[in-house]
């Protein structure tokens, strides 16, 4: 059983240290451990070229136009049975680097779309994708903040697990953490998070758990949260209404007070649309396939070309100072 720890903080700073605290605890449970300081790796931002989604829905393979370390990083994550991310909290949320790896995960590594690609490859008489891409994985997140600005980081962090459909064990943040290594309660909690992750990873191995079929059968430690489906706790409330949508899984409903706490009420008949389960991913993949098809046809449309040419000619972009001679 292998546990990978990934820190996105300064070298040997609080995030690195707390990640290693959890890894040490996982090692004591029998895990093989590995540590990555992600700032040492060349990870570029997603350009939005959609080569990945087109490659998947058209059966061409897993494609990315960026030439950097992300593919190697993704393979490291896939090889592990459990993964822990420890990320500094920037302006209440995840770091820019963390957002970049989340953007790079989806849709190019979305399990639903990869299943579609796997089927297309096999239909064409070719070898399908490596089965390990469809194996379930335990994943945990910890945000480390210097103050109490932290309430967006849990949703930001969980987005990384959304595309592959991996199981989130713990998703937490620690505030006021400049001296966190001296705060015994938080150090002990990190040890517990490491042990929880090792236990969940071992359960996945023992049950040979795949992403498909394990969406509602995995019992993990949870906090009391508003939405029992994805354990989301952040919602967009439509102005002037009681209608809201979970920022994580996309289910829509209303917030109600039950036993002194907010609970999210939604129609169970809509659950198949949720972004974190395969049925919702297949729907999303079909939407992308149809939209890409419409766009490809538009490229042949004279009116489309005319409008593109008109607005492209309105103004030129200002050159980047670093690229000027």
Feature locations, PLM:
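Short beta-strand elements in bilobed, periplasmic/extracellular small-molecule ligand-binding domains
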Residues: 32-35, 166-175
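A charged, well-structured terminal subsegment
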Residues: 163-171, 191-208
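Catalytic cores of secreted or luminal carbohydrate-active enzymes
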Residues: 181-192
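Active-site-adjacent alpha-helix of alpha/beta-hydrolase-fold enzymes
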Residues: 21-29, 153-167
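Short, histidine-centered active-site or binding-site loop motifs used for metal coordination
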Residues: 7, 143-145, 173-175
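Active-site rim beta-loop-alpha module in soluble metabolic enzymes
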Residues: 176-180
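Helix-loop-strand module that forms the ligand-binding subsite of alpha/beta enzymes
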Residues: 61-161
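N-terminal beta1-alpha1-beta2 submodule of the flavodoxin-like/Rossmannoid cofactor-binding fold
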Residues: 1-102, 106-107, 197-198, 202-325
């Amino acid at each position: 059983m292998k546990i990978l720890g990934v820190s996105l903080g300064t070298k040997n700073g609080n995030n690195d240290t707390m990640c290693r605290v959890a890894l040490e605890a996982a090692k004591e449970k029998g895990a093989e451990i590995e540590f990555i300081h992600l700032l040492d790796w060349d990870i570029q931002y997603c350009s939005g070229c959609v080569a990945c989604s087109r490659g998947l829905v058209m059966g061409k393979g897993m494609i990315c136009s960026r030439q950097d370390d992300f593919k190697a990083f993704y393979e490291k994550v896939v090889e592990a049975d459990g993964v822990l991310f420890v990320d500094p909290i920037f302006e209440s949320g995840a770091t820019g680097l963390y957002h970049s790896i989340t953007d790079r995960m989806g849709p190019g590594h979305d399990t639903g779309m990869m299943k579609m690609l796997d089927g297309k490859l096999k239909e064409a008489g070719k070898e399908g994708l490596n089965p390990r891409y469809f194996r379930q994985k335990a994943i945990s997140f910890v945000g480390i903040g210097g103050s109490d600005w932290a309430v967006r980081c849990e949703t930001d962090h969980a987005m990384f697990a959304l595309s592959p459909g991996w199981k989130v064990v713990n998703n937490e943040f620690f505030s006021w953490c400049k001296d966190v290594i001296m705060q015994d309660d938080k150090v002990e909690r990190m040890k517990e998070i490491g042990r929880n992750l090792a236990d969940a990873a071992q359960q996945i191995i023992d049950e040979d758990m795949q992403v498909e079929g394990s969406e509602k059968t995995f019992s993990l430690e949870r906090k009391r949260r508003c939405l029992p489906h994805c354990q989301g706790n952040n919602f967009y409330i439509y102005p002037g209404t009681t209608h809201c949508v979970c920022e994580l899984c996309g289910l829509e409903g209303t917030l109600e007070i039950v036993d002194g706490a907010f609970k999210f009420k939604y129609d169970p008949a809509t659950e198949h649309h949720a972004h974190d389960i395969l049925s919702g991913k297949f729907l999303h993949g079909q939407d992308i396939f149809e939209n890409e098809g419409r766009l490809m046809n538009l490229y042949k449309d004279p009116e489309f070309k005319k409008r593109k040419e008109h607005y492209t000619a309105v103004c030129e972009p200002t050159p980047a100072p670093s690229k000027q001679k």
